[in-house]
Each structure stands twice: as structure tokens, then as C-alpha cells.
Amino acid sequence: MQLQSSLDNLIFLVLLLVTIIYWASIILSNFKSLAKVGFYGTVLANSLIFCLLGSRWINYGYFPLSNLYESLFFLAWGITFTTIVLEYKTKTSIIGSISNPISLFITGFAGLSLPESMQAPSPLVPALKSNWLMMHVTVMMLSYASLIVGSLLGIFFL
């Protein structure tokens, strides 16, 4: 539980710093290195979320998508992953400056607002002890993440 709490806070801090760095890179467009720092910060946040989810998977023996806390962190992981891929392909920092605040809000809500009882893992009900859970929920959450990023970009370029 201590590792989870530490990773929660670290992920929130990294995403907060990355959001500030991305916004500063837009305001101070002469400093191109700020956008690179923001990109690598997003990669770090993505890796930390992966470590959080991986540690829960190893410690509790099931794929971590069975409660709201785990699902929100997986959604934040999907958003940061989509951001990394799109930003790498397009070489623009606008994507990170728009999508990282959403990841920040999601992780902030999951780690700081949800009560401990909702963050704690519980045994899976028999209906969720299926290999289909991992495949179905993973694909759905990744599609939600790409939909969120696409919607944000659509609104931005409107």
C-alpha cells in the first residue's frame, strides 16, 4: 500500500510538472528544449503508471481493471500512451499540452479523491474471473483514451 501511495503522488507530481512545462513551451516558443523535456516527462509518467498497474497485477494476481481506481489509472496510461505516439509521429507539442492536463485530473481524482476503500483491491467476483475481462476491458479503455485525445484535439482545432 505504501508503494501505491508513493507512486500515486509521484505520478501526480510528474504530470503536474509536465503540464506546466508544456504550457511554458507554448508561451515561450523560443525554447524548443522545453517541449522535449515535456515529452520525456510524459514518457516518465507513462512508465510510472505502468509500474503502478504492474505492481498491482503482480501483488494481487489479476489484471488491474476491476475497480474504479485501477480503471482510471489505466485510462490515464492510455491517454499518455496515445499522447506519446501522436507526439512522436507529428513532432508537435500541442498534443501534450492538451492531453496531459486530462491525465493529471484523472490521476488526481483517482489518487487523491477516492477513499481508501475504493482504492483497495478486493477479490474478483466469479463473473470477472475470465480471460475475456483482460481483452475486452483493455480494448475498451484504450479506445476511450484515444477518443478522449481525439475529442480534445478536435475541440482545440475547431
Segments (PLM) and residue ranges:
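Polytopic transmembrane helical bundles with strong interfacial aromatic enrichment
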Residues: M1-L158
